[in-house]
Amino acid sequence: MSECLMFGMDCEARCMTSMTADEENICFLVGTNNIKNDKNQVNKLFMDPEASRLMSKTFRHPAGEVRAIAAHPTKSTILATCTADFSSLGGTHSITIWNIEEDKRTLETVSRLPTEQVMSCLEWEPNSMKCAAMTPFRPEIQLLNMENGPEIVQNLKIPLENEEDEMFSATWSPHHDGNMLGVTGGRTAWCIDCRTDNEYLKIRDAHIHRTISMDFNPNLQHVIATCGDDGYVRIWDTRSTSSALTSLHPHAHWVWSVRFHPVHDQLLLTGGSDASVVLSCAQSVSSEQQIEFRDDEEEEEDDDLVEKLQDGQLERIDEHEDSVYACAWSSADPWTFASLSYDGRMIVSNVSRKHKYALMQL
């Protein structure tokens, strides 16, 4: 494992996103959720020019707790948050678009949409001004027009198996022009066609207890990954879902987040309640399943020896001391990833040189 960079925030935090609009600098946004409203903030974390330490710019979040955060796909000064303010009886909740005032170190409200319940998920579609938002307590996804709003333009109904089941996550497919949404709730994973509000795919009992998160393979449109509180990550072929293509068991407790590498889809990044971040390989079911690589000539007596990257755990980071709720790949450097634990600890790591060279066949 390569050396990690660490940064500690003043408050608890469980939501993080990469700044997709900044393709030159490694940069992430983190929102805190402290019960004391005046302490909550949005942190912009980035590398110093020598990439030797993490730097932070802090912006007070005046709307209370940050329950979800999304970065604008093309404008680095715009972000959106799902907010929760419990300073009054019953609390107030909203989805708010902010403009980052770098010089003033403030967040300027662009527009705000009050919501009846606290929203726990907010996903900006990469190629449009559309967002998906959800609450854990209602079986539906709200599609929002972020250009004139946030403004609700569509409600997608999710057919939960049991009324008491919670909704967990929503993820946009990169293959369907912003028309396909991956959703998890209860023990089930769905792919929903936003044009018809119809269920395109349903994987019942994807995990034993709860199916918490999912992601789409960036290179194979028929392959998805799910994770759950059974500690497993499962990879599925959406054309035949009677059984998973493969199952990995990288965590000893709940897995909160799973993310495919943006280029090399055999790499999977996960974070879990066992305070660990794991980089796994699923070479056998990837688009690059025939990849082979040469070991460094200085380390191998026979430079013609060719090996394959094997399925299973590649790297494990145990530098967190609390549940890891979020992990993300950098938009500027595909070999860099970040993880966030509930105690506010942010760790930025790199794929080790050994595995990087293996994937690049160097």
UniProtKB/Swiss-Prot annotation:
Compartment(s): Cytoplasm
A GO CC term assigned to this protein in UniProt: cytoplasm
Tissue: Expressed in the hypodermis and the pharynx.
Knockout-associated phenotype: Defective egg-laying and slow, but coordinated locomotion when stimulated. Reduced levels of both unprocessed and processed luminal and transmembrane cargo in the motor neuron axons of the dorsal nerve cord. Double knockout with either rab-2, rund-1 or vps-50 results in reduced levels of both unprocessed and processed luminal and transmembrane cargo in the motor neuron axons of the dorsal nerve cord.
Acetylation as UniProt keyword: no
GO biological process per UniProt: positive regulation of dense core granule transport; positive regulation of egg-laying behavior; positive regulation of locomotion involved in locomotory behavior; protein ubiquitination
Family annotation (PROSITE patterns): WD_REPEATS_1, WD_REPEATS_2, WD_REPEATS_REGION
SUPFAM superfamilies documented for this protein: WD40 repeat-like (SSF50978)
Keywords of the record: Cytoplasm, Repeat, WD repeat
Classification via InterPro entries: EIPR1 (IPR040323), WD40/YVTN_repeat-like_dom_sf (IPR015943), WD40_repeat_CS (IPR019775), WD40_repeat_dom_sf (IPR036322), WD40_rpt (IPR001680)
Functional summary from the UniProt entry: Plays a role in the trafficking of cargo to dense-core vesicles, probably through association with the endosome-associated recycling protein (EARP) complex. Important for neuronal function.
Protein family: Belongs to the WD repeat EIPR1 family.
PANTHER family the record matches: EARP AND GARP COMPLEX-INTERACTING PROTEIN 1, WD-REPEAT PROTEIN
Name used for this protein in its record: EARP-interacting protein 1
Gene encoding the protein: eipr-1
